[in-house]
């Protein structure tokens, strides 16, 4: 089925974990000649990222979780108001279908679409279903999940389960391309470690990695690090590296512009376990040491990592377990026997769904074909 002249609304916002999978789908829809419009919030990350690629409309929306009593009282009124505004926007855009990728903005847009009989697809990136998507699941035409979710039958009705499909996380095409490339781990003198702190940085990771490099050198492990610190911790982290030879540092930067190059360079990654990072590591076949964010809602980052860990393709340390001793206990054997990294790489590639974007595109075409 052709999507030519079909008006498809993408709604996602707040964090890169919502935005980048949505961008991958939006680009594929555009390649299939659909008219794509993005709906986000004006003060979040999507406002600075999306306009370079797609037309974006804004709805002011915020969440209620962990907020004060006043905001909890006024939240239903704000949601109703934003839903009415969203209905008007969807009618103006002559929307044929809405795809929600999470973030608070997805709530009013997807609710409005359901109210005026516009089909809705929602996509959950994490291994725990977020509050917004738990609510929207009742109204969605199709529910797409990135991971198998524990005890899903206790969270969804039989009707909701019947319209649920596991599709994986959409990943940028340049990272998907790494899936076809075999990683060759030679017993060279240098172990290349990529450190990812996420867009906001990870203070605990940023603090321990320079100490890890120093300790490794003392024990004869030659590590070279490419360290993405996040925007808040760059100078502080650079200062922690001041006594470490430049021979052990590839780069220290707030952001990495081309993640495909970084993934391709690395032998091993140390990172949080956000859904997108986990999926990208798996598709790229990159062994990982995951340090889940302790404050993640419903501990979802810990659960995101479990599929890779259970398939012997990575490790997971709680933040309180992230000591020099525990990190070295993982890194030493991998450094001594690089074939272990090669085996982990092969297993990682088997854990994630490679054609996630195409599966979601297929859902779009089936819904519009039956509309």
From Swiss-Prot:
Gene that encodes it: murG
Role summary: Cell wall formation. Catalyzes the transfer of a GlcNAc subunit on undecaprenyl-pyrophosphoryl-MurNAc-pentapeptide (lipid intermediate I) to form undecaprenyl-pyrophosphoryl-MurNAc-(pentapeptide)GlcNAc (lipid intermediate II).
Top-level taxon: Bacteria
Name of a matching Pfam family: Glyco_transf_28
Positions contributing to UDP-N-acetyl-alpha-D-glucosamine binding: 15-17, 126, 172, 199, 256, 275-280, 301
InterPro entries for the chain: GlcNAc_MurG, Glyco_trans_28_C, GlycoTrans_28_N
One function term, GO molecular function aspect: UDP-N-acetyl-D-glucosamine:N-acetylmuramoyl-L-alanyl-D-glutamyl-meso-2,6-diaminopimelyl-D-alanyl-D-alanine-diphosphoundecaprenol 4-beta-N-acetylglucosaminlytransferase activity
Name of the protein: UDP-N-acetylglucosamine--N-acetylmuramyl-(pentapeptide) pyrophosphoryl-undecaprenol N-acetylglucosamine transferase
HAMAP family linked: MurG
Subcellular location: Cell inner membrane
Catalytic activity line of the entry: di-trans,octa-cis-undecaprenyl diphospho-N-acetyl-alpha-D-muramoyl-L-alanyl-D-glutamyl-meso-2,6-diaminopimeloyl-D-alanyl-D-alanine + UDP-N-acetyl-alpha-D-glucosamine = di-trans,octa-cis-undecaprenyl diphospho-[N-acetyl-alpha-D-glucosaminyl-(1->4)]-N-acetyl-alpha-D-muramoyl-L-alanyl-D-glutamyl-meso-2,6-diaminopimeloyl-D-alanyl-D-alanine + UDP + H(+)
UniProt keyword list: Cell cycle, Cell division, Cell inner membrane, Cell membrane, Cell shape, Cell wall biogenesis/degradation, Glycosyltransferase, Membrane, Peptidoglycan synthesis, Transferase
Principal localisation: membrane
Membrane-topology annotation of the record: Peripheral membrane protein
UniProt family annotation: Belongs to the glycosyltransferase 28 family. MurG subfamily.
Pathway: Cell wall biogenesis; peptidoglycan biosynthesis
Keyword Isomerase: no
GO CC annotation terms, alphabetical: plasma membrane
